[in-house]
Amino acid sequence: MFKNTFQSGFLSILYSIGSKPLQIWDKKVRNGHIKRITDNDIQSLVLEVEGTNVSTTYITCPADPKKTLGIKLPFLVMIIKNLKKYFTFEVQVLDDKNVRRRFRASNYQSTTRVKPFICTMPMRLDDGWNQIQFNLSDFTRRAYGTNYIETLRVQIHANCRIRRVYFSDRLYSEDELPAEFKLYLPVQNKAKQ
């Protein structure tokens, strides 16, 4: 999808405020919902993915199962709200041995397991909004001893709220981020009466 696109800086694949946030995504819902709502904490539109079973409610990109993203930028960044329920996401990458590897992170697992084609790992989320930063190049090297070439697919499962999902060429400090890539929490008015 993005193979022939010049890739530097930031490449966003989901922005909850956009006119069609799931334009390049496919949705699967069983016993749950995927809808856009206003989050009270940030007073802004977000995408809510909720389901009784994490494996049957998710969004996946690209929408066409035969296509791949072709994103070479090595950092995946997701701005996600912890709903204090089970949550998992999965990223499929291609390495320099031409092997497709999957990385699955979840908040209900306690150990990391590396198998030939999938690496599952625990993820701890803070209360409220989180910025998940995933160094795909480093994970590929540490888990498989190979080099990251590109990201093929991203799948985000229930249960979470999503503000933005993007790739970047490196990790940026808060000051370096473009305004629309930051998560603004409304300033609490602490004036004393």
From Swiss-Prot:
List, alphabetically, the InterPro entries matched: CFA20/CFAP20DC (IPR040441), CFA20_dom (IPR007714)
Q: Where in the cell is it found?
A: Nucleus; Cytoplasm, Cytoskeleton, Microtubule organizing center, Centrosome, Centriole; Cytoplasm, Cytoskeleton, Cilium basal body; Cytoplasm, Cytoskeleton, Cilium axoneme
| Chief localisation class | nucleus
GO BP term, pick one: positive regulation of feeding behavior
Q: Which Pfam families match?
A: CFA20_dom (PF05018)
Q: What keywords is this UniProt entry annotated with?
A: Cell projection, Cilium, Cytoplasm, Cytoskeleton, Microtubule, Nucleus
Q: Name one GO cellular component term.
A: nucleus
What does the UniProt record say this protein does?
Cilium- and flagellum-specific protein that plays a role in axonemal structure organization and motility. Microtubule inner protein (MIP) part of the dynein-decorated doublet microtubules (DMTs) in cilia axoneme, which is required for motile cilia beating. Involved in the regulation of the size and morphology of cilia. Required for axonemal microtubules polyglutamylation.
Give the family per the record. Belongs to the CFAP20 family.
Write down what this protein is called. Answer: Cilia- and flagella-associated protein 20
Question: Which organism is this protein's natural source?
Answer: Xenopus laevis
